[in-house]
């Protein structure tokens, strides 16, 4: 019996008269790769989600891939989900769309885990991981795209002391896109990464780091996750760091939006009393189009250390490249940083003369060239690494416009502001 409302059972093909063409299409794609495994091990929901069960994915098939020594591909376990797309065509989970349209969310997730010598059977924790990601997608409606990064902040297996604690989203190198009678889908592969690899993906682009990972034999062209890997690709091959830095200089960063621990407050309000209450009230504004944008004299921005770690990259690789950046928090507050090149675009209501305006819980800040130069210089200290622990809170002051930025240790802003209940799933989404 697997955890999380799943059980392990031998694969049972669907009777022909059931005619579940979405499920059958995935089966055929898998059989083309694994013709010797027509009946793979399968994790299946004890009670399907459409019958009220807690597990969103109906099935996860698990194959043994024997690898390819010539290509540097090790033996590994290949996990393939069933449930993000329309499996049945009868509307029980996803509305029917038809050929040429997205089937359900338009993708299934896969995961490749290196087989260890001690493995007598495939580990089952990846099935729980895929279901957690499915819960996020089903509850929020936010899809996982190629190049997206998923900060996780703990070993993916939740038991070891592995440094593989985050994820990137690649395309499965072997499973093709499908056009089924119930719609189209592609297979997007979850790839476990280290903190260094995650930071590089955030600073540049997830797709670029994924391409670099394929060149390193410890990961290879099939993007194998090895929970025993102890070094990042940038430690294995220092030349890859130079490629990322060159990419940032040439392209900027593709990271345009992140959900993080952050907060904005009218600078004229007290953070401890009126400001926090005002934040709660404005956070209730769901229909922003009914509220006229209002001008602020100054704004107080609060970030935890993890979110603040992005500020230098945002200034140099986004805003100074003419690209916007959007912070979003768990209370539906948004901080939209807008460079001069984006002023005047549809939906932008700030400019040089009115640089600070808000609409409900949505804040826009016009970042002039002079402000960006100051930010680039001031935020340099956030990237300095030495043996001394930074002193918190850290403050940055800007006068044109009036902006106070306070950085708190990771986890402390959440407790002090008390504006997030439960675990925050911080998901970064790349700009397409």
Please tell me what each predicted stretch does.
Residues 111-146:
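Compact, glycine/acidic-enriched structural inserts
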Residues 119, 156-158, 175, 421, ...:
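A generic structural micro-environment signature
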Residues 132-133, 211-214, 387:
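Short, surface-exposed linear patches
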Residues 115-117, 196, 371:
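Residues that cap or initiate secondary-structure elements
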Residues 265-432:
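Long C-terminal appendages of very large multidomain proteins
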Residues 94-119, 408-411, 416, 423-429:
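Short acidic, glycine/tyrosine-flanked loop/strand segments centered on an H-E-D-like triad
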Residues 1-31:
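N-terminal alpha-helical "arm" segments
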Residues 15, 21-24, 32, 36, ...:
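Aromatic/basic-lined ligand-recognition segments
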């Amino acid at each position: 019996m697997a955890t999380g409302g799943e059980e392990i059972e031998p694969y049972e093909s669907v009777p022909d008269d059931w005619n579940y063409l979405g499920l059958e299409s995935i089966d055929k794609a898998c059989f083309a790769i694994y013709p010797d495994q027509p009946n793979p091990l399968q994790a299946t929901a004890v009670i399907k989600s459409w019958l009220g069960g807690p597990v969103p994915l109906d099935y996860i098939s698990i194959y043994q891939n024997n690898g390819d020594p010539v290509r540097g591909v090790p033996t590994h376990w290949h996990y393939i989900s069933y449930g993000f797309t329309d499996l049945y065509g009868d509307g029980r989970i996803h509305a029917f769309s038809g050929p040429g349209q997205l089937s359900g969310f338009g993708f299934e997730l896969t995961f490749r885990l290196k087989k260890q010598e001690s493995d007598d059977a495939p580990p089952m924790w990846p099935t729980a991981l895929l279901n957690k990601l499915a819960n996020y997608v089903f509850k929020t409606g936010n899809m996982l795209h190629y190049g997206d990064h998923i900060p996780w902040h703990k070993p993916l297996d939740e038991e070891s002391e592995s440094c593989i604690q985050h994820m990137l989203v690649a395309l499965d190198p072997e499973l093709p896109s499908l056009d089924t009678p119930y719609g189209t889908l592609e297979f997007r592969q979850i790839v476990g990464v280290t903190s260094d690899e995650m930071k590089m993906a955030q600073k540049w682009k997830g797709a670029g780091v994924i391409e670099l990972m394929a060149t390193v034999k410890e990961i290879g062209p099939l993007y194998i996750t090895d929970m025993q890997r102890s070094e990042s690709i940038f430690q294995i091959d220092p030349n890859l760091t130079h490629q990322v830095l060159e990419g940032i200089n040439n392209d900027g960063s593709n990271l345009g939006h992140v959900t993080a621990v952050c907060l904005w407050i009218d600078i004229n309000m007290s953070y401890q009393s009126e400001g926090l209450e005002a934040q709660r009230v404005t956070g209730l504004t769901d229909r922003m189009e009914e509220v006229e944008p209002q001008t602020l004299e100054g704004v107080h921005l609060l970030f935890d250390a993890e979110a603040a770690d992005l500020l230098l990259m945002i200034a140099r690789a986004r805003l100074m490249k003419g690209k916007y950046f959007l912070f979003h928090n768990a209370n539906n507050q948004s901080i939209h940083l807008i460079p001069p090149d984006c002023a005047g675009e549809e939906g932008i209501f700030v400019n040089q003369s009115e640089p600070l305006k808000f609409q409900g819980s949505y804040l826009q800040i016009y970042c002039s060239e002079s402000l960006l130069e100051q930010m680039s210089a001031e935020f340099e200290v956030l990237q300095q690494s030495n043996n001394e622990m930074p002193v918190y809170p850290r403050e940055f002051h800007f006068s044109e416009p009036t902006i106070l930025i306070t950085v708190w240790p990771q986890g402390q802003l959440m407790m002090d502001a008390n504006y997030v209940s439960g675990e925050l799933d911080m998901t970064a989404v790349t700009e397409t």
